[in-house]
Amino acid sequence: MSWAPVSTWSRRTPLAACCSAPELPPAGAWKACAAGSLRIGPQGRCKMMKNWGMIGGIAAALAAGIYVLWGPISDRKKYRKGLVPGLLNLGNTCFMNSLLQGLASCPSFIRWLADFTSKYRQENNTTEHQHLSVTLLHLLKALCNQEGTEDEVLDASPLLEVLRAHRWQISSFEEQDAHELFHVLTSSLEDERDRRPHVTHLFDLDSLEFPLEPQRQIHCRTQVPIYPIPSQWKSQHPFHGRLTSNMVCKHCQHQSPMRYDTFDSLSLSIPVATWGHPITLDQCLQHFISTESVKDVVCENCTKIHAAQIPNSQSVENRKTTFVKQLKLGKLPQCLCIHLQRLSWSNQGSPLKRNEHVQFSEFLAMDRFKYRISGCSTSKQPANHLSAAEQETTDGKEGGAQNPTMPFLNGACSTSYISPPFTSPLPTNPEWTSSSYLFRLMAVVVHHGDMHSGHFVTYRRSPAAKNQKLTSQQWLWISDDTVRRTNFQEVLSSSAYLLFYERIQSNLHHPEDQRAAEK
């Protein structure tokens, strides 16, 4: 034969050459080749056919690999349009993945993180990779297609490493609770905020010229005044709110001083369902702020009244009466996280999960649960400003009473009263349009399983396009690294565990006005 065997050629030729035809012999050698092949016999011809089959198989495999790596990119981009990346499950980290997808659906929280990191990450001594706010911001922006990545699945293990640096022992191989992780994140962000410098920057001329509390100046050893930083309330995260606690004596109607407590999420118990009637989110909120009687509370006013009725020589004991206590929402956050308590206990002390469906809606009016000061006007206010009840600390009355004739009350309605989510970016229901504290649903976290094991998934809105300011009406179902489109009716029929709402301005109906309200 006039050329090397195919097997020898294939060993000496580069791998890329396998995709092209082998070098052909001179024209005069064809006859000798044919004669030689006839002399080889059946076994030789079979061997040559196997060699040619091997070359064809290698070429086909390389062609398929090239197509997979470079060919379908445009198709994948077309398919991913409107979708978001999924998150890799690192063992049992579905609780973290579902929470991150829910947080990524809240634009106000991402904007706050961006502003927070730009102001304070240069003021701390820790390196940038140790900042929870920086790590969380990059991850949430990537989940909203704002980081320019083409990865369909992201790895959230850097977040676990940062939390461990904050001394949180979170294992990726043990099932955790998404609501508990939410409070771990918010408390760690507050710790990061509190570690910033406690004096005003020299280039902060406004704070130096007009200090908020000049009477509380701090003096160093040289007696040079160091002005305090502005109030930390200005840098609170968007989930931060305040509760008011009001107690009134049932005997003398004396009202104790108002107390304020902070919250990052509203943890609502699920009331017992009435036969034939569904449980609604409105009922859970009403149950949260319902009055309760507190017995054996010392009433200073009753003690004074009793002391005035007895001679001075006799000692006066503190009068204990029954007080009525009620909670109200003193400050509503920009982003509202609602936790539905699905843990209950059997008579034997075993944990049980409540699987009742709680009806919720796309829009949530919170005016009836808001604390208002006596004489405070109920006129509409912009969503990005605090009301007088949020700024004052004096006593006051309860919020507006519930109108029993309203057909819709935060989930207590039939589907005929639900505003179609695909036709209008803003609500058209009268209760919603007249609300001063209106919220829009952004994400729902659902837990499948029992109290001992299960899986978390998330329903969330698809991020709005870069050239579009209105909120997207496309909903997604996300389970770790699996992302698919879904419809809003599937979202409403889910058994919610965490609900993420974001405050909007209800009395505006034009896109230009909504863009101004969202700034």
From Swiss-Prot:
Gene Ontology CC terms, in alphabetical order: mitochondrial outer membrane; mitochondrion
GO molecular function, one term: cysteine-type endopeptidase activity
E.C. code: 3.4.19.12
Record key words, sorted: Hydrolase, Membrane, Mitochondrion, Mitochondrion outer membrane, Protease, Thiol protease, Transmembrane, Transmembrane helix, Ubl conjugation pathway
Catalysed conversion reaction: Thiol-dependent hydrolysis of ester, thioester, amide, peptide and isopeptide bonds formed by the C-terminal Gly of ubiquitin (a 76-residue protein attached to proteins as an intracellular targeting signal)
Topological domain spans for side Mitochondrial intermembrane: 1-52
Name of this chain's protein: Ubiquitin carboxyl-terminal hydrolase 30
Species assigned in the record: Xenopus tropicalis
